[in-house]
Amino acid sequence: MTESWIHPSAVLLLGAVILPLLPRAVRRVFIVLVPVLAFGAVLLMQGHNGVYGVVPFMNWELTFGRVDALSLVFAYIMTLMCLIGSIYGLHVEEAAQHSAAWIYVAGSLGVIFCGDYLTLFLFWEMMAFSSVFLVWFRRRKQSLASGYRYLLVHTAGGLLLLAGLVLRYKATGDLNFGPIGVADPQLYTYLIMAGFILNAAVPPLHAWLPDAYGEATVTGAVFMCAFTTKTAVYVLARSFAGMEILVPLGVCMALYGVVYAVLENDARRLLAYHIISQVGYMVAAVGIGTPLAINGACAHAFAHILYKGLLFMGCGSVLHMTGVSKFTELGGLYKKMPKTFVFTLVGGLSISAFPLFSGFVTKAMIVAAGFEAHNYWAGFLLTLASAGTFLHTGLKVPYFIWFGKNNCSQKTWERAGDPPLNMQVAMAVAAFLCIFIGCYTPYLYDMLPFPDVAAQYHPYSAAHISETLQILLFTALGFFLLLKKLTPEPTISLDLDWFYRMGGRLFYWFARKPVQSVDNAVGEAWNRQGIVPLMRTARFWSWFDWHGIDTVVDGTARGVRALGGVLRLVQSGSLQINIISMAAVVALVLTLLAFV
């Protein structure tokens, strides 16, 4: 297995590079083939746990392939969802959209299989910088702005993560990605956790999610709803299992997302808010940290990727066919889009934890783990959040899109109809899996990190079925009694991002007005009181240098130069030559006188 081990990210990255180079005639086959190969690479790893793809780098070892039960369950569903999403997007002609989606998935899978923090950070940033194009490819002004905010937030999260990793390496000298000492947390522990929970969309670090997912392309939103937050759940489960602070954070997410989903008028933004709620269950489960809770987090992530992807595909189909996604502009579409209605209904029943659907066998595992760990308050509040889930996603979405008052314009009504065949096939596959998992639990339970614990959990007990049906039926009764109050309105719900958006404007005003005014005043005062005296002083010293110091120096230099000329004459030998010549003449005269 070591020699034949293939990283699914390598398959997707290679496919992303090759796809734009292929002729259009073969692209559709290739778009399906690449995810199939990536899914096959994960299937080949089943039963072959171990460490693969270790690469020496400077003084470290980069581990690209840590294969165990925890990584495999996430890799399995992520590659499967990549295949479903690629089929859903077959009608998209722009190759760059498919390439961006595959690079995004490759980043997620790289994080799933990594064994060290350096590799994790590499793939973590790959996720952020590739997924933003799934927002920008919609090519609207709002999408460009939303993508820019998305990138800024994730860049900040990446910096927090990097700071934590650097501090951890300095303190421990270890880059291995594994459990962090939650019993004795250090500063780097909280920095790393902050980087992770930002991707999990934990309030108040959550506003990027509905902002970006609501503005993404139809196919891009299907990919985005499946990978970023679930990758964050994986890294939290790997490194922060049992971190108690995650329990209240997760419960807060579950309730917060439900409230804002009820208020939302846009279908895809509603689903985005509900991602926050459902991921809250997983975060709380990681905080509980028991084997049953970790199983619940993994199982719910598995199911959530499928049914949330199905819901985004259904609402995306409505947007694709009609150009509209607001409830106040839709209604009565079950006649025009009957197949899409059925698929979306399956997703709504799954997310509402209706018996025989996937959410029923996964969500309750987390609630049961909470009660088992004596976190009764968490168990009760998560049960309350389940009622809210059925209220907005199980009832509000189907009612105001498919039934209810027909608010469609004539153009919207004429354009409405079931989407292209590839989109229907993708929704059908996801819908089938939602039902299959709910009816045959061993398919999912046997993949979980603690299969023995999962085998002892029985979701179809009389008490659980009775409790669930009571919650669902009373929620439905409340929905229809309060239907007028729950009717969507064409308004915008203010979220916590208002504070940093307004804070940004306040900072901009503060920089332009008070700070700039003070800077101008100080500058003018300096010009009057500082620059003028300084220039006068400079001119004086320039004059003194020119007429004083330079005169002395130049005069001295001229004297030295003259003396040097004299000394040079002596040193050169001219005087000696004259003396010798005179001596020679005298000697010659004396000789002549002697012989004459």
What are these regions (language model features)?
Residues 50-65, 172-182, 237-239, 363-370, ...:
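Membrane-interface helix termini and inter-helical loops of multi-pass transporters
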Residues 6, 13-17, 440-486:
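A generic transmembrane alpha-helix motif of multi-pass inner-membrane proteins
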Residues 84-95, 99, 105-120, 130-415, ...:
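Hydrophobic transmembrane alpha-helices and their helix-loop junctions in integral membrane proteins
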Residues 24-35, 145-155, 336-343, 417-431, ...:
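Alpha-helical transmembrane segments and their helix-start/interface "positive-inside/aromatic belt" motifs
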Residues 1-99, 173-182, 505:
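Transmembrane helix-loop-helix hairpins at membrane boundaries of multipass inner-membrane proteins
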Residues 58-74, 181-189, 369-381, 457-464:
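Short aromatic-rich membrane-water interface segments that cap or initiate transmembrane helices
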Residues 350-365, 431-452, 528-529:
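Alpha-helical transmembrane segments and their membrane-interface junctions
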Residues 444-466, 486-596:
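Aromatic-capped, Gly/Pro-kinked transmembrane alpha-helices
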